Amino acid sequence: GCCSDPRCKHQC
């Protein structure tokens, strides 16, 4: 998911 992706982790 996004929480594991550094490109969108800031959204978590």
UniProtKB/Swiss-Prot annotation:
GO terms for molecular function: acetylcholine receptor inhibitor activity; ion channel regulator activity; toxin activity. Transmembrane segments: none annotated. The modification 4-hydroxyproline is found at residue 6. The cysteine framework is I (CC-C-C). Alpha4/3 pattern. Disulfide bonds join 2-8, 3-12. Belongs to the conotoxin A superfamily. Its main location: secreted. Alpha-conotoxins act on postsynaptic membranes, they bind to the nicotinic acetylcholine receptors (nAChR) and thus inhibit them. It is found in: Secreted. The modification Cysteine amide is found at residue 12. Occurs in 2 forms, Reg1b has a 4-hydroxyproline at Pro-6, Reg1c contains unmodified proline at Pro-6. Keywords: Acetylcholine receptor inhibiting toxin, Amidation, Disulfide bond, Hydroxylation, Ion channel impairing toxin, Neurotoxin, Postsynaptic neurotoxin, Secreted, Toxin. This is Alpha-conotoxin-like Reg1b/Reg1c. Expressed by the venom duct. It comes from the Eukaryota. One of its GO terms (cellular component) is host cell postsynaptic membrane. Coiled coil: none annotated.
